[in-house]
Curated annotation (Swiss-Prot):
The keyword DNA damage applies. NCBIfam families: reco (TIGR00613). PANTHER family: DNA REPAIR PROTEIN RECO. One of its GO terms (biological process) is DNA recombination. This is DNA repair protein RecO. The keyword Cell inner membrane does not apply. Involved in DNA repair and RecF pathway recombination. Keywords: DNA damage, DNA recombination, DNA repair. InterPro entries: ARFGAP/RecO (IPR037278), DNA_rep/recomb_RecO_N (IPR022572), NA-bd_OB-fold (IPR012340), RecO (IPR003717), RecO_C (IPR042242). It comes from Coxiella burnetii (strain RSA 331 / Henzerling II).
Length: 234
């Protein structure tokens, strides 16, 4: 039986040409997660989708189909587009590439959908690096790979800002005897871990550490194929 979905909130993560006049879209939706849909005749001069299928624009989208590739139906605007420019636009592309690489089709991601929309708004108005780190943390949490940021793995004590902790994948953070001059790349200050826990990124040195920690963690999920947008960012 053909499944039909009517006017689901959505963002377009990616679009690519298909045949002479159509497009294949990668969508992010709250109740159906990542959805792949064929927009037939979307590139035609008289297409009903003309001007509607833009990235970073909140939409209401209908589709039908039983296979992984759905058939796009009605599309309506669901708010003003987020106008990203320059580095903010690259950040938006980075978010989209992350989601395409890490999300499965047809798994609901209600909270992640709202995190994504809030992140787009912050990219328009706020600090880019801090906004990306916050979204990466939220993404890991939603995927079930969130970092254990409540305490150290051995003593079960809260992090202290003047202490240092070694990151042990699949376990957590172990209190260790390291100094700020340490060149160990898997050692992080308690100050930085507390900043990540609280999603407060006012300190530039902590932000640099958190960026490395996020990359270290995400790389384990992404595998050997690098993200194209990382080569362009910062």
């Amino acid at each position: 039986m053909t499944k039909r979905v009517a006017l689901e909130p959505a963002f377009i993560l990616h679009r690519r040409p298909y045949s002479n006049t159509s497009l294949i879209l990668e969508l992010l939706t709250p109740n159906h997660g990542r959805v792949c849909a064929l927009a037939r005749s979307a590139r035609g001069l008289k297409s009903r989708y003309k001007g509607k299928l833009e990235l970073f624009s909140p939409l209401l989208i209908s589709w039908s189909g039983r296979s992984d590739l759905k058939f796009l139906g009605d599309v309506e605007a669901n708010g003003m587009p987020y106008l990203l420019e320059g580095e903010a636009l690259l950040c938006g592309f980075y978010l989209n590439e992350l989601l395409i690489r890490l999300l499965h089709h047809d798994d609901p991601y209600l909270r992640l959908f709202h995190h994504y929309q809030n992140t787009l708004e912050k990219l328009v108005n706020g600090r880019l690096e801090a906004t990306l780190r916050c979204f990466e943390k939220q993404l890991l949490d939603e995927l079930g790979y969130g970092l254990p940021l409540s305490c150290d793995v051995e003593m079960k004590l809260p992090f202290k800002p003047d202490q240092f902790y070694q990151y042990l994948p699949d376990r957590g953070f172990l209190l260790c005897e390291k100094s700020e001059e340490s060149e160990e790349r898997d050692v992080f200050s308690g100050k930085s871990l507390l900043a990540l826990q609280e999603e407060s990124f006012s300190d530039e040195s902590s932000l640099k550490e958190i960026k490395y920690l996020m990359r270290l963690t995400l790389n384990r999920l992404l595998g050997k194929k690098p993200l194209k947008t990382r080569e362009l960012l910062f």
